[in-house]
Swiss-Prot record:
Tissue and organ distribution: Expressed in mushroom body (at protein level); overlaps with expression of Sh/shaker and nicotinic acetylcholine receptor (nAChR) components also involved in sleep regulation. Expressed in the adult brain and head. Enriched in the mushroom body, anterior optic tubercle, superior protocerebrum, antennal nerve and visual projection neuron fibers projecting into the lobula plate of the optic lobe.
Organism, as annotated: Drosophila simulans
Membrane topology: Lipid-anchor; GPI-anchor
Name the UniProt record assigns to this protein: UPAR/Ly6 domain-containing protein qvr
Entries under InterPro entries matching the protein: QVR-like (IPR031424), Sleep_regulator (IPR050975)
Amino acid sequence: MWTQRNAVGNWLLVLTAVIGFLTFIWIPQTSAECQTRSIYCYECDSWTDARCKDPFHYTALPRDQPPLMTCNGCCVKMVRHQRSRYEVVRRMCTSQLQINLFMVDHVCMMESSGNGHMCFCEEDMCNSSKNLHTNGCQLHLIPIAVAVSWLMGQLLSR
């Protein structure tokens, strides 16, 4: 028999499927964009070039900024010993790293000690940012997915 509870449960299943499909389609495209088009990334190390330190002066004249390089990957910003007098900032392209990771735009990885991090981004000169933020689209999907999962759990436990 068709009840209101069945209708709500079916609606939630459809919503979950749509969110899952959009997430499945969107995330691989984000990674693929990073690897298939050239962008410009800053190339510097604050140990040898004070212009690389945070706060980064992205409004300075190009001659007063660290060099840019063409990148066939993602821009990277690495920080070691953050918020200390020994802080070191390095900005580069992923093609210079000897790691093989599935990279998604605006993802940051923290050092286990909590004293540093490495962030990836896919736009021209994006590794000039002091704080790279998680992509807004992903942030909107997470609460929706959690809410749908909770509601489904409530309905199925009855």
